[in-house]
């Protein structure tokens, strides 16, 4: 790499739930930008972490774990994870050193068959296994897919993550940086909150309200005591839809708010105050400006 060359690109971290994707990203960046938990599915949307190096910018994408989707939200999360495979320059497939390949890994390997980007196998939690066991795991996975590299790491301790970053750097194409060098991440909590509220609208109103509902989080503030204040607007196209969502004496809107609040609190691992409003935005689904404002373009 000469002084005139700059390399940049997007790198997707994929794997089954709770394999350590968020922990790895936080360790590489040297800061906690992604919620981590012992519970699977802590990450519910793609989260970008920007790693700036001399002559290089790596934009990491931490995706939801790929799993068997059951709920609408889970299907959305899996779609987000799988779609990232088609949009990046390098793919990091993260597995655990202390577990054998299972159905979830086979599902991911099947999806990788159509990937055009080079795939690096990252074997996490090497601090938990003996060297002989690690070598067996590396050989087993290498026989399942033509990985560009196989890198053992410990996301918890940071062992060998420097080598991983160097491998990624060498695989990136030439190009200018995508973000200013003082930007660490673009964390879309408000977009995830909007999706959760929208799902509750669909579930609680059933077929009474069509899918022409857009939720916009207009305010997202954290107080000194840790309480997060969220204000969101549920946009509908007709007055009759507004009445259904509000319900008799406001009971339906109250239910939507209560169920959404519980799920958001579990996601963010803190208390929240959720304030919901319903607004008639006539024919918003056909209005280019409104579509842009609501985040659909």
UniProtKB/Swiss-Prot annotation:
Residue numbers spanned by region G2: 41-45
Domain of life: Bacteria
Pfam families referenced in this protein's UniProt entry, alphabetically: KH_2, MMR_HSR1
An individual GO BP term: ribosomal small subunit assembly
Stretches the record annotates as G3: 62-65
Domain KH type-2: 205-282
Keywords: Cell inner membrane, Cell membrane, Cytoplasm, GTP-binding, Membrane, Nucleotide-binding, Ribosome biogenesis, RNA-binding, rRNA-binding
GO cellular component: cytosol; plasma membrane
Membrane topology field: Peripheral membrane protein
Residue ranges, annotated region (G5): 153-155
Single GO MF annotation: small ribosomal subunit rRNA binding
Subcellular location per the Swiss-Prot or TrEMBL entry: Cytoplasm; Cell inner membrane
Annotated residues for binding of GTP: 15-22, 62-66, 124-127
Region (G4): 124-127
Region of interest (G1), residue spans: 15-22
Domain Era-type G, first and last residues per copy: 7-174
Major location (coarse): cytoplasm
NCBIfam families: era (TIGR00436), PRK00089.1 (NF000908), small_GTP (TIGR00231)
PANTHER family: GTPASE ERA, GTPASE ERA, MITOCHONDRIAL
Family label: Belongs to the TRAFAC class TrmE-Era-EngA-EngB-Septin-like GTPase superfamily. Era GTPase family.
Job of this protein: An essential GTPase that binds both GDP and GTP, with rapid nucleotide exchange. Plays a role in 16S rRNA processing and 30S ribosomal subunit biogenesis and possibly also in cell cycle regulation and energy metabolism.
Subunit note: Monomer.
This protein's name: GTPase Era
Source organism of this protein record: Geotalea daltonii (strain DSM 22248 / JCM 15807 / FRC-32)
Gene expressing this chain: era
């Amino acid at each position: 790499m000469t002084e005139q060359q700059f390399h940049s690109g997007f790198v997707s971290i994929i794997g089954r739930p709770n394999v350590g994707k968020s922990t790895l990203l936080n360790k590489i960046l040297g800061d906690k930008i992604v919620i981590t938990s012992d519970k699977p599915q802590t990450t519910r949307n793609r989260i970008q972490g920007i790693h700036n190096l001399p002559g290089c910018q790596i934009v990491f994408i931490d995706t939801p774990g790929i799993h068997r989707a059951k709920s609408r939200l889970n299907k959305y999360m899996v779609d987000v994870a799988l779609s990232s495979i088609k949009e990046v320059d390098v793919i990091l497939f993260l597995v655990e050193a202390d577990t054998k390949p299972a159905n979830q890994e086979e599902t991911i390997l099947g999806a990788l068959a159509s990937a055009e980007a080079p795939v690096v196998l990252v074997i996490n939690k090497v601090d938990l296994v003996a060297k002989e066991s690690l070598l067996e795991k590396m050989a087993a996975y290498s026989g399942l897919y033509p990985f560009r590299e196989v890198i053992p790491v410990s996301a918890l301790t940071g062992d060998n993550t420097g080598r991983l970053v160097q491998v990624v750097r060498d695989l990136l194409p030439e190009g200018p940086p995508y973000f200013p060098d003082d930007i660490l991440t673009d964390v879309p909590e408000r977009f995830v909150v909007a999706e959760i509220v929208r799902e509750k609208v669909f579930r609680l109103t059933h077929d009474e309200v069509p899918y022409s509902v857009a939720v916009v989080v207009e305010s997202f503030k954290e107080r000194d005591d840790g309480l997060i204040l969220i204000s969101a607007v549920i946009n509908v196209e007709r007055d009759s839809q507004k009445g259904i969502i509000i319900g008799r004496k406001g009971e339906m809107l109250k239910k939507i708010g209560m169920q959404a609040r519980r799920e958001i609190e579990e996601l963010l691992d803190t208390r929240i105050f959720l304030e919901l409003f319903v607004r008639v935005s006539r024919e918003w689904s056909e209005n280019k400006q409104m579509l842009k404002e609501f985040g659909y373009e």
